[in-house]
Amino acid sequence: MEKLRSGFISIIGRPNVGKSTLMNQLIGKKVAIMSDKPQTTRNRIVGVLNAPKGQAIFLDTPGIHKPKHKLGEIMVTTARKTLGEVDLILYVVDASEEPGGGEQFISQMLKDIKTPVFLVVNKMDTVSREEGLKKISQYSQMVAWQELIPVSAKEKTNLDRLKDLIFAKLPEGPLYYPAGSFTDQPERQLMAEMIREKVLHATREEIPHSVAVIIEHLQETPKGGMVVHATIFTERDSQKGILIGKGGSLLKEVGQKARQEIEALLGTSIYLELWVKVKKDWRQRPDVLRSFGFDEKME
């Protein structure tokens, strides 16, 4: 009988290359929020793939970029810390983009890491075959890789092949998480991220990056439902007004869409109560970052 294989895989790449979409598709569950805004992922998120061959534990890390504020520094530190602690690195690049300074920076960083690297060329569905082959050639010369896999996370193209290669590389060993687990994130964090995702989709410019969501209180109802009290923090009064919208229209839209996903997560009906508050320049304030769950010492 074939022995089980289990291990940890870090998914890295510059912002907006599709890392969260890739992880969600690989495990078949939505554990990381998705947006076309760069730097959507802020913490290291764990997603667990359970398969007959064993268990693959994915760490979806923040996109590696040049930080512009204290939160950005924490995000990049979080991404870099995982690289020497895992069994495998999936370095995700975007087939629709030319390699640039971000890829050069990451490739240089990987030279000092002994962990095996799979180069995953994502978004192959967005380019022609000729252009895709050109990008594969360009990216393949930038980093020492053990496997090179062109995929489309959005269309689920070549993901089964990627899974097979991942399990072939993982060490033999027992399951790290109970069978059936798909993430280590608490429900409160999942709910907060679902709300933040809807804010990202509904806003533009600086507002998406200026928002933090905290679940303040959960209360069960006599009929078995749940009341969820959440606060959306932003940095300026002008942003607060935009987030609320005319007559509360934008906040209502965010709440309606987030409620549907939270109900699917909890398996029960919920009443979602959203508040918007200003916490001036919170991304630059270590005390506020710690209270929001961001910390340089985060694993």
Swiss-Prot record:
Primary localization: cytoplasm
Cell compartment(s), UniProt: Cytoplasm; Cell membrane
List of residues binding GTP: 13-20, 60-64, 122-125
Boundaries of every Era-type G domain copy: 5-172
Alphabetical keyword list: Cell membrane, Cytoplasm, GTP-binding, Membrane, Nucleotide-binding, Ribosome biogenesis, RNA-binding, rRNA-binding
Residue span(s) of domain KH type-2: 203-280
Disulfide bridge positions per record: none
Function: An essential GTPase that binds both GDP and GTP, with rapid nucleotide exchange. Plays a role in 16S rRNA processing and 30S ribosomal subunit biogenesis and possibly also in cell cycle regulation and energy metabolism.
Protein name from the UniProt record: GTPase Era
Protein encoded by which gene: era
